[in-house]
Amino acid sequence: MNYQSWIQHFRTNRLDRPEPDWSAPFSMPEKRRRLLARSIAEYQLGDGGGECCLVAQDAEAFRATGEEVREVVDLWFAEEREHSRLLARAVRRIGAEFVTTTFAFELFYAIRRRLGVQFEMLVLLVVEIVSTGYYRVLRRHVGDQPLADMCRLILRDEARHIDFHRDRLAARHPAGVGILWKWWFRLLGEACVWFLWLGHGRCFRALGGTRGEIFRHLRRGQAAFLAKLAKRCATTQHVTTGTTGTTGAHLVSSPIAH
């Protein structure tokens, strides 16, 4: 895996980030505003508002496997903190109160802590894909330019986070991921999107969104990820088996891949 390429991406991506015009007038029917306020406040907590780092019991051992590993993980989570900052501005814009905990938030962190860093990173990948659906639906239906602009910024980042996970997994599985992994990937996606709908469905409906939109975004996102991962794995396998020296070995044994 090309660590330096991803480190450079995260550093460069800090630039050219036009801030939404938070001072623009805000107007929304009260019922819709109230539901949106709760939804965005909960998302602000989950999207970098808690412990914005790997929290699995073996996370520090994983980060300590190399300076490049530590740096790329830290840069990735720095971008998540930026999302939390943007969402905090959105919370203030719509007159919401900040949320300090929810059942879903506590469950999310409990799972991440107990099941190991590789499972945690799988969960985070799935959440990135589910969140893409959340922000797309919000951007389409919110009817407020600064909030839509915030969604565009976050979606730009999320797309590259998903690519980052694809490269990481291709380095670990040059022959492709197995059926069990795909099963877990799909199952976690369905579980996460149901949690999303149960927690935010009233907001989506008030804005004009539907359950079908959210579920379609998840399933299309997962299908696209698996297709791109298979293509990348084929390329990685060719490099690994077709070269000698350190390049192929690095792709297979890279610490971030295991």
Regions found by a protein language model. Give the residues of each.
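Non-heme di-metal
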Residues: M1-H258
